[in-house]
UniProtKB/Swiss-Prot annotation:
D-ribose 5-phosphate binds at R197, D221, D225, T226, A227, N228, T229. The active site is at K195. HAMAP family: RibP_PPkinase_B. Belongs to the ribose-phosphate pyrophosphokinase family. Class I subfamily. Binds 2 Mg(2+) ions per subunit. NCBIfam families: PRK01259.1 (NF002320), ribP_PPkin (TIGR01251). It comes from Nitrosomonas europaea (strain ATCC 19718 / CIP 103999 / KCTC 2705 / NBRC 14298). GO terms for biological process: 5-phosphoribose 1-diphosphate biosynthetic process; purine nucleotide biosynthetic process; ribonucleoside monophosphate biosynthetic process. This is Ribose-phosphate pyrophosphokinase.
Length: 316
């Protein structure tokens, strides 16, 4: 593929991110009419020639999740029927990813696999995503999946602020690998919060493994949803004598009363990226700060289109 053939289209989920990405690429955003019929069905019309082009559909499957997902599927179908040479679904925040396995023989779906099947069925040739909730989701696809990492963006902000007496904290055992990687890059200590989760979207902090007294604690996670876990973790760290608690998370889901919880919690600052657009109350919250991943996504798209290495973006 040549650079001249690269095109980017988007739906209604995160148009600002799409505009920032094409600005980085120095191209125009693909023209398409994405709307609704009178009964609420998704309506799509591609308004320019895409025949033979390398096309990316940039859309996070964030709230409204089902509409965002349906828009991707319908846009991809329209592009394939218009003879696009290759269509990559660029999904920075991959929704439905938290149900990635059956637990204890429960009668539940594996929604991450369902979404993978849906994307494949409409003719997606490749998937580009960022900080998947679990890496094994890549194996649910029979097409190439590029899962890029927001760590360089988050790490750059940490270096910029030059926090003193730093310690990286994993909010749970499942996030230890991510936290250990960050601690290695920062050449600092690692702490782990041991917790028990009595029911979905609720967690109880039980124990902190590591000495956080007098330290600047940086919590790292892939997403912040209800912020229950995050705020409880901040309180536990402060009780153990932490000087300050700063959280870094790629995906700002921030559902329900999450923003209110953050504002009234022991958390000093929450830093997120723009894979998901911030709600109005989150934008006004002085404890929530947003970084852009547009350059990282744009460079990833360019390298995919040019058949260049993506992994070299993340080599230490």
């Amino acid at each position: 593929m040549s650079y001249d053939s690269l095109m980017v289209f988007t739906g209604t989920a995160n148009p600002k991110l799409a505009h920032d990405v094409v600005k980085y690429l120095n191209i125009n955003l693909g023209r398409a009419n994405v709307g609704r019929f009178s009964d609420g069905e998704v309506m799509v019309e591609i308004l320019e020639n895409v025949r033979g082009n390398d096309v990316f559909v940039l859309q996070s499957t964030c709230t409204p999740t089902n509409d965002s997902l349906m828009e991707i599927l319908v846009i991809v179908d329209a592009l394939k029927r218009a003879s696009a040479s290759r269509v990559t679904a660029a999904i920075p925040y991959f929704g439905y990813a938290r149900q990635d396995r059956r637990t204890r023989s429960a009668r539940v779906p594996i929604t991450a696999k369902v979404v993978a099947n849906m994307l494949t069925s409409v003719g997606v040739d490749r998937v580009l995503t960022m900080d998947l909730h679990s890496d094994q989701i890549q194996g649910f696809f029979d097409i190439p999946v590029d899962n890029v990492y927001g760590m360089p963006i988050l790490l750059g902000d940490i270096w910029k602020h030059d926090y003193q007496n730093l310690i990286v904290v994993s909010p749970d055992v499942g996030g230890v690998v991510r936290a250990r990687h960050l601690a290695k890059r920062l050449e600092c200590d690692l702490a782990i919060i041991d917790k028990r989760r009595p029911k979905p979207n609720e967690s109880k902090v039980m124990n902190i493994i590591g000495d956080v007294r007098g330290r600047t604690c940086v919590i790292i996670d892939d997403m912040v949803d209800t912020a229950n876990t995050l705020c409880e973790a901040a309180s536990a760290l402060k009780r153990e004598g932490a000087a300050s608690v700063i959280a870094y998370s790629t995906h700002a889901v921030l559902s329900g009363k999450a923003v209110e919880r953050v504002q009234t919690s022991d958390l000093d600052k929450l830093v997120v990226t723009d894979t998901i657009p911030l709600r109005e109350d989150a934008s006004k919250c002085n404890r929530i700060h947003q970084l852009s991943v547009a350059s990282l996504l744009g460079e990833s798209m360019l390298r995919i289109s040019n058949e260049s290495s993506l992994s070299s973006l993340f080599i230490e």
